[in-house]
Amino acid sequence: MERQLLIAGLDGATWTVLDPLLATGRVPTLANLITRGSKHSLRSTIPPISSAAWVTMMSGMNPGQHGVFDFRNLDLSQYTAHDERLANAGSYSVPTLFDYLSQANLTSIAYQVPMTYPPWPIRGQMVAGYPTPDHQRAYTWPPELAGSLGRLYTHSPDQIGAATPAGQASIYHRYITTMTDQLIQLSRGSWDLLMFVNGATDGAQHRFFKFTRPGFPGVSPAEQQQHGHLLDDIMIAADAELGRLLAALPADLDILVISDHGAMPRPGQAFNLNAWLAREGWLNLRAGASATRRRSQQLVEWAKQTLPITDWAKRRLPARFKQQLTSLRSGAGSIDWPRTQAYRVKLSHPIEGIHLNLQGRQPAGVVPTTDYEPLRQEIIARLRTRPEILAVCPREAAYHGPHLANAPDILLQLQPDFDGGADLVEIVTPIPAGWLQSISGYHDLDGILVAAGPSFVPQAALAQQPQLQDITPTVLHLLGQPVPANMDGRVLLPLLASSRPVVVSSPLPNTPAGDNQLSPDEEAGIAAALRDLGYIE
């Protein structure tokens, strides 16, 4: 064993939250690593959602290469833009960091890395990460490892969602402690790479951001006074438990601390792409659809606030009814498709998509292939005049690879004060209060990176912002391995003390990491975990 490397993933961690804690000395483990090493902002994927982001991190590839854009499979032949299947480890066939290290006879421990369910054989051990069918139990490779670990979470997603804010925080604290206990247990063997992802840091931001921002809709000053410390407390606990883990590991360890994306308070207003497209003449509604759509939205909002519908009930809805709900939420059923040239594709904040209704591709496509590029450029040009839009580009500017055709034709980044919305009439609308209450924290594009240890340059400076796809090439190089030629990421050489040149190798062949076909019970359990944090409805 030449070097040992720890990759500590703090899902959704952002310097916006951590910098004040660093300034007041409340995250001493992180502060020590920054003093010994260097601190950077890490650019996420487009969109910055954990499914796409962690697969990009593991593979060193953009979503156009690995094919994961969301927690649901994109199916742009449907006007809802998604099918009802959920992405999992079998949804991508590209090799991961763990596969490359296994080929090199290096041993990995992969603990709770998202998008590793179902787990697959590697040289080492894998404990599958979010989302899994039952997050109270461990799903592992080898399978017998699960029996020695015990439970991960003490509560189901339903129970976490129903708990008080203080109760939710208590559940997260117990999870972080359990995680560290299990990591210390796993680390007692021989290994070259130990990687874990702490999901509590992301869950806490989704739930508790509303208590940290004065004037957040629906939150009283008394509630902010009572619960305003909860988010900081989770970050402080994550830092303390990272310190406890490091104390049990070799002192000369190399360490990377990363997050898959950043976080921010959820915006209070929505930019409704379909309404804008209708105003510009590229989308048409069926007769009477706007009034029906508005009443349906009001009914959905009332039901979400009033009816005690549990995940147990939701998971037993017939597939046909689920598809109808998806159509209702997206507004697809209200659109007159034979008279529509372009429509919204919902992605993850702050990224939105637009697809052209192309002849031969969509069920009722009307745009001739000869008009595709002129129409796309016209829409892009008009979007650039909107104050709600920060950036807009064709899909080829963000992605490349065999899955490019699954991506929306146009991608746009909203200004921080706007979410994407599905209203078909008003271009800008307020976000319903109930939605802000249930999920008050959102993702943004900038996560964190800290590099410390003997192999890293103290106070290293980077001329370009590092990207999440750079992590795996950098790790392979640090561990003495060649970098596959088809990786999009680059080795972050200014971080590394060694001047050894990068060796480029042929990639491993694409082979599915797991079984893409999940059982109905597996799908239902994973859907419950995703619904708990607002990734699906």
Give residue spans per PLM region.
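Active-site-proximal alpha/beta segments of enzymes that process anionic O-linked groups
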Residues: 16-189, 199-206, 308-316, 322, ...
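A long, amphipathic alpha-helix that forms part
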Residues: 167-194, 204, 210-257, 284, ...
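Polar, surface-exposed loop/tail segments
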Residues: 374-381, 385-407, 463-466, 470, ...
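Low-complexity, glycine/alanine/valine/leucine- and proline-rich hydrophobic stretches
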Residues: 417-472, 477-478
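Secreted, luminal/periplasmic, and some membrane-associated catalytic domains
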Residues: 19, 71-90, 94-104, 111, ...
